[in-house]
């Protein structure tokens, strides 16, 4: 397991401010660990492709859990059972009913877009622009995720899929889902703490589009994900060359 403790301007170490329990994620996947201004712990596990796990203290959120993808079998048994499962949209690399069942426990909330719920036959529907309080100091807002390049619009139509912006005691994390650098991003919060942007043309963004989106969002940390064969090193190189000040973290696990 790789563990990183990352402390940015809005993720200050204030251990005396909070006695909340936080169990380290003990998994083979890379984990980044942050502290909120209120002293809570945020852990993010880089599982594979579009699948990540976010733990706020001991409250675990699985995003797009898929057990088998790209010839790999993911070790979800290494994680605690999820308190919440969030699905961005209904494609097979995001929605897998068997994996949802495997990571869930009694009382797990499963939240997804309408087409995913229709396809799965279960789930709590959440649409673009809607917000939910998942737990104390844990909120999520569904934001648009769609294609805009001519000829690609049918892959992810506008108004269907979700990205998710999490507010974790003021620590902002964005998982884009399958999207391009859509105009809506201009209205998203600027300076979010951690942003996951999908980058695998022709389904989501090119490396150039990912750079453009990052320059609009201006996050503290960017993690390109849902990568496929994208040259993720180019994303980092271009942002560094532009003097963006964005800390770009690259993971082969997210191909």
Where are these regions (language model features)?
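C-terminal motif of bacterial Sec signal peptides marking the signal peptidase cleavage site
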Residues: 15-17
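Bacterial signal peptide processing site
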Residues: 19-21
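Metallo-beta-lactamase
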Residues: 23-39, 47, 112-171, 249-255
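Pre-active-site segment of Zn-dependent metallo-hydrolases
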Residues: 25-39, 47, 51-90, 97-101, ...
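Active-site neighborhood of phospho(di)ester-bond hydrolases with catalytic His/Asp-centered motifs
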Residues: 62-66, 82-93, 110-114, 174-177, ...
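Active-site HxH/HxHxD metal-binding segment of metal-dependent hydrolases
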Residues: 73-135, 139
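Binuclear metal-ion centers of metallo-dependent hydrolases, dominated by the metallo-beta-lactamase
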Residues: 124-138, 158, 211, 215-255
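Active-site-proximal loop/helix segments of hydrolase catalytic cores
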Residues: 148-216
């Amino acid at each position: 397991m790789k563990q990183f403790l990352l402390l940015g301007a809005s993720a200050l170490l204030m251990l005396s401010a909070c006695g909340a329990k936080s169990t380290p994620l003990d998994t083979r996947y890379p984990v980044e660990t942050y502290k909120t201004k209120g002293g809570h712990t945020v852990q993010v596990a880089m599982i594979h492709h579009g699948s990540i796990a976010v733990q706020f203290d001991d409250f675990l959120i699985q995003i797009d859990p898929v057990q088998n993808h790209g010839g790999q079998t993911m070790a979800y048994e290494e994680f605690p059972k999820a308190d919440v499962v969030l699905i961005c949209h209904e494609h097979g690399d995001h929605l897998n009913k068997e994996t949802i069942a495997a990571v869930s426990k009694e009382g797990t909330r499963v939240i997804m877009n309408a087409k995913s719920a229709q396809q799965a036959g279960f789930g709590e529907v959440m649409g673009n622009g809607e917000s939910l309080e998942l737990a104390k100091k844990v909120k999520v807002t569904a934001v648009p995720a769609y294609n805009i390049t001519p000829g690609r619009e049918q892959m992810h139509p506008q108004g269907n899929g979700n990205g998710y912006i999490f507010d974790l005691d003021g620590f902002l994390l964005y998982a884009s889902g399958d999207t391009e650098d859509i105009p809506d991003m201009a209205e998203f919060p600027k300076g979010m703490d951690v942003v996951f942007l999908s980058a695998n043309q022709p389904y989501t963004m090119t490396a150039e589009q990912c750079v453009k989106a990052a320059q609009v969002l201006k996050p503290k940390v960017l993690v390109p994900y849902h990568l496929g064969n994208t040259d993720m090193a180019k994303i980092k190189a271009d942002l560094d060359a532009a003097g963006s000040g964005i800390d770009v973290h690259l993971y082969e696990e997210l191909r």
